[in-house]
Amino acid sequence: MSRMAEQQLYIHGGYTSATSGRTFETINPANGNVLATVQAAGREDVDRAVKSAQQGQKIWAAMTAMERSRILRRAVDILRERNDELAKLETLDTGKAYSETSTVDIVTGADVLEYYAGLIPALEGSQIPLRETSFVYTRREPLGVVAGIGAWNYPIQIALWKSAPALAAGNAMIFKPSEVTPLTALKLAEIYSEAGLPDGVFNVLPGVGAETGQYLTEHPGIAKVSFTGGVASGKKVMANSAASSLKEVTMELGGKSPLIVFDDADLDLAADIAMMANFFSSGQVCTNGTRVFVPAKCKAAFEQKILARVERIRAGDVFDPQTNFGPLVSFPHRDNVLRYIAKGKEEGARVLCGGDVLKGDGFDNGAWVAPTVFTDCSDDMTIVREEIFGPVMSLLTYESEDEVIRRANDTDYGLAAGIVTADLNRAHRVIHQLEAGICWINTWGESPAEMPVGGYKHSGIGRENGVMTLQSYTQVKSIQVEMAKFQSIF
């Protein structure tokens, strides 16, 4: 693909040049080619976007629930019509296989938008009787202008997960995509405008997180920030949001999730789940089950089943329908993953497979890392303690149920957890003791629109998806009505 035209900001229903004068490049990680130069939003651009959003939000909130619902449903239709085009762009920008982006990224994002479009008319207040002459009623009102700050692994899906409930509740959103993968969020802005969203209700500001993102978190005109990213960055976003104007926040942060295989489990099923929990999207999924706990007596058999499945991984041309494994999202990220792999070897973990870059025709110019499985791991190893966010699985053994629950919970993270067992009593007994916000039994990874997702501990605050997220983009106003004559003590 030839280099794209320089990408601008999207403010008030159209493209506009950044006043900062700064730019950055977005790279195709499969081959290292520059896809486009992208303009970076500065402080003045954030001010412009907030002013635009304030204007648009008033128009948007004044529409009826059914009017807003119809506009968002039109956006859903356009997303599905343009699925292949958007998936190709997402593949170029992220490196993910087209077999994945064409069936997951836009599809699941559109599902979430459709879900919230249907919920808009159900946003209701309540009535509370006090006495014969008085009652209270409540209204759910939009927050106003909110900000979404996205991660690089699911660019358009994250933009939809954040904008769908925000817009459904009557807010305007300013979205800052990751500077690593900024392209499809701009296309989403076009789609919202085409669907009839008032100008300013969805503005997109590409830029560097430390600058553009910080300006958004500090801006007094923004009522809430929804952030997806790492723990350290999340803490900064939360601190800035609180210090500036006590903004509400939703934080979807990192994870180091446990997958527990019990001795009664079907090991073929367990191996299939472990593969999806570690190598889907080349391991760049925040909920990945990278700590795989296996009974000591099952270790050898389980290792062989994992090795057999690694052989089925198909890396290569990301647009080949048979390819199911792409490069990492960027060269700096690849280098970071390789540092973790080196650390694992240094600390005594045994490499069962992988452990290096992929080499050969088609790989040498890209950010490719081989699917890697470490065994003979211990809980104190760096690769077991820290989030790697790449195709690196760590196998650990255990002896008892109590032991594995304790070890699974021995982490600052609490995003996800899963178990594989044939015993449903055990399944529920154990899952209720795991300190994680998203849990799976005999499956892994699905996050449908109806399911609230978010983390415990350092893995986040608040939830995305589900009814409660729509409510989190509103504020409750209580109104007391008195029909009897008011009595003053003065």
Curated annotation (Swiss-Prot):
<feature type="binding site">
    <location>
        <position position="27"/>
    </location>
    <ligand>
        <name>K(+) 1</name>
    </ligand>
</feature>
<keyword id="KW-0630">Potassium</keyword>
<feature type="binding site">
    <location>
        <begin position="150"/>
        <end position="152"/>
    </location>
    <ligand>
        <name>NAD(+)</name>
    </ligand>
</feature>
<comment type="pathway">
    <text>Amine and polyamine biosynthesis; betaine biosynthesis via choline pathway; betaine from betaine aldehyde: step 1/1.</text>
</comment>
<protein>
    <recommendedName>
        <fullName>Betaine aldehyde dehydrogenase</fullName>
        <ecNumber>1.2.1.8</ecNumber>
    </recommendedName>
</protein>
<dbReference type="InterPro" id="IPR016160">
    <property type="entry name" value="Ald_DH_CS_CYS"/>
</dbReference>
<feature type="binding site">
    <location>
        <position position="387"/>
    </location>
    <ligand>
        <name>NAD(+)</name>
    </ligand>
</feature>
<feature type="site" description="Seems to be a necessary countercharge to the potassium cations">
    <location>
        <position position="248"/>
    </location>
</feature>
<comment type="function">
    <text>Involved in the biosynthesis of the osmoprotectant glycine betaine. Catalyzes the irreversible oxidation of betaine aldehyde to the corresponding acid.</text>
</comment>
<feature type="binding site">
    <location>
        <position position="93"/>
    </location>
    <ligand>
        <name>K(+) 1</name>
    </ligand>
</feature>
<dbReference type="GO" id="GO:0008802">
    <property type="term" value="F:betaine-aldehyde dehydrogenase (NAD+) activity"/>
</dbReference>
<feature type="active site" description="Charge relay system">
    <location>
        <position position="162"/>
    </location>
</feature>
<feature type="binding site">
    <location>
        <position position="254"/>
    </location>
    <ligand>
        <name>NAD(+)</name>
    </ligand>
</feature>
<keyword id="KW-0560">Oxidoreductase</keyword>
<feature type="binding site">
    <location>
        <position position="460"/>
    </location>
    <ligand>
        <name>K(+) 2</name>
    </ligand>
</feature>
<dbReference type="Pfam" id="PF00171">
    <property type="entry name" value="Aldedh"/>
</dbReference>
<comment type="similarity">
    <text>Belongs to the aldehyde dehydrogenase family.</text>
</comment>
<feature type="binding site">
    <location>
        <position position="180"/>
    </location>
    <ligand>
        <name>K(+) 1</name>
    </ligand>
</feature>
<dbReference type="GO" id="GO:0019285">
    <property type="term" value="P:glycine betaine biosynthetic process from choline"/>
</dbReference>
<feature type="active site" description="Proton acceptor">
    <location>
        <position position="252"/>
    </location>
</feature>
<feature type="binding site">
    <location>
        <position position="246"/>
    </location>
    <ligand>
        <name>K(+) 2</name>
    </ligand>
</feature>
<feature type="binding site">
    <location>
        <position position="26"/>
    </location>
    <ligand>
        <name>K(+) 1</name>
    </ligand>
</feature>
<feature type="modified residue" description="Cysteine sulfenic acid (-SOH)">
    <location>
        <position position="286"/>
    </location>
</feature>
<feature type="binding site">
    <location>
        <begin position="230"/>
        <end position="233"/>
    </location>
    <ligand>
        <name>NAD(+)</name>
    </ligand>
</feature>
<dbReference type="InterPro" id="IPR029510">
    <property type="entry name" value="Ald_DH_CS_GLU"/>
</dbReference>
<keyword id="KW-0479">Metal-binding</keyword>
<dbReference type="GO" id="GO:0046872">
    <property type="term" value="F:metal ion binding"/>
</dbReference>
<dbReference type="InterPro" id="IPR016163">
    <property type="entry name" value="Ald_DH_C"/>
</dbReference>
<comment type="subunit">
    <text>Dimer of dimers.</text>
</comment>
<dbReference type="InterPro" id="IPR015590">
    <property type="entry name" value="Aldehyde_DH_dom"/>
</dbReference>
<keyword id="KW-0520">NAD</keyword>
<dbReference type="InterPro" id="IPR011264">
    <property type="entry name" value="BADH"/>
</dbReference>
<keyword id="KW-0558">Oxidation</keyword>
<dbReference type="InterPro" id="IPR016162">
    <property type="entry name" value="Ald_DH_N"/>
</dbReference>
<feature type="active site" description="Charge relay system">
    <location>
        <position position="464"/>
    </location>
</feature>
<feature type="binding site">
    <location>
        <position position="457"/>
    </location>
    <ligand>
        <name>K(+) 2</name>
    </ligand>
</feature>
<keyword id="KW-0521">NADP</keyword>
<feature type="active site" description="Nucleophile">
    <location>
        <position position="286"/>
    </location>
</feature>
<dbReference type="InterPro" id="IPR016161">
    <property type="entry name" value="Ald_DH/histidinol_DH"/>
</dbReference>
<feature type="binding site" description="covalent">
    <location>
        <position position="286"/>
    </location>
    <ligand>
        <name>NAD(+)</name>
    </ligand>
</feature>
<feature type="binding site">
    <location>
        <begin position="176"/>
        <end position="179"/>
    </location>
    <ligand>
        <name>NAD(+)</name>
    </ligand>
</feature>
